Amino acid sequence: MYITDNETKKALLIFTDIFSGPASNSHISRSTLQEKSAKALKEIEEKELKSLVETIFLKPLSSLRFRIAKENPATLVGSGQLEKIAQAIEEEGADLVVFNSAVSPRIQRNLEAALNTCVIDRSEVIIQIFADRAQTREAVLQAELARLEYSMPRLTRRWTSLAQQRGGAKGTRGASRGAGEKKLELDRRRLKTEITKLKKEVERVRLQRSEQRKTRLNGDKKIGAIVGYTNAGKSSLLKKLSGAEVFTEDKLFATLDAETRKVFLQTGEKNIQILLTDTVGFVSNLPHQLIDAFRSTLEEAALADFLIIVCDAAHPAMPECLEVTKKVLDELSCSDKPSIIAINKMDDIFDEAQLLNLKERYPEAVEISVTTGQGLEGLKKKITDIIIFDK
């Protein structure tokens, strides 16, 4: 894994688009609309990677975007594109290169050899953020497991780099390589042992969480899960509805643990008590290592009676963020649960056309602002309706 030190490192950002050829003339108007949409999504994609990179205290430099017919199996991009990356590294003084697309261990080694610069991908950045953000024992275990599983196939990268630094004197290269291979094998065994141990510990925590769930499920209180894209305001909403202290911060992946709090709702003269659980935020192309490691936390959504899907109204790609959330929920087999879409941060929207578009596109959604309290009573009413209807 790439660990930053006290000195701020500068990162060159690389994006690749698979190009399948020009659109036919019979679809010119349609392709024009698609191109406009694609351009907007590319801008959002670049902003998101920049934000992720800044979260691990790297300084993002310029972004290079390449269109490729297909991925080069050796270096992902073509030789001419590789030269442009090398030129940008030299001109901008980049310390490392960050690819937005997934980079295999083999391609990563080849790129580092060709560019003589550290190369990481978006998955590694996200895993590093999770490792930095982990606070509780459960989150630390899960983040460490994801980190080790990601690092395992990349071990040879360390030793290739070390061998290049040593150079190897004439007549000693064979012995040096043999020692390196021996050390590499020892490291692999050690890592496998650590991964096995961590998996057992994570499973133990998972069982404990399962027992806690059983206790909650056996009670008479309905359970809701707050889900959504990272930094949409999920923890702030839980804090506002429950009145309890919940850790909140305006950062990506500020919450990695499933926090559960009591919430009291009023229906007529009767008080209803429910349990609401905050969950880890989603992001597009979340590394599978993290999905596997944090499955016990994500399962809180799968076992809930209903879902509150929180969206950030001010996010330029809110519809795409909502689709990412729905995709993850589908993977967890809970997309058919009763759900409420809560569009948060409405106090940040001042454009009348944007407001109208949100109302037309999501007529069933509740427009809220955790900051001002706007729409929270309406949200509580929706929750109450779900609970009464579900009885």
UniProtKB/Swiss-Prot annotation:
Sites where the protein binds GTP: 228-235, 253-257, 278-281, 344-347, 369-371
UniProt signal peptide: none
MF-aspect GO terms: GTP binding; GTPase activity; metal ion binding; ribosome binding
Magnesium is among the record's keywords: yes
Subcellular localization, as worded in the UniProt entry: Cytoplasm
PROSITE patterns: G_HFLX
Disordered: annotated segments: 162-181
Keywords: Cytoplasm, GTP-binding, Magnesium, Metal-binding, Nucleotide-binding
Primary location group: cytoplasm
Cellular component GO terms, alphabetical: cytoplasm
Description of how the protein assembles with itself and partners: Monomer. Associates with the 50S ribosomal subunit.
Family: Belongs to the TRAFAC class OBG-HflX-like GTPase superfamily. HflX GTPase family.
PANTHER family on file: GTP-BINDING PROTEIN 6-RELATED, GTP-BINDING PROTEIN HFLX
Functional note: GTPase that associates with the 50S ribosomal subunit and may have a role during protein synthesis or ribosome biogenesis.
Protein known as: GTPase HflX
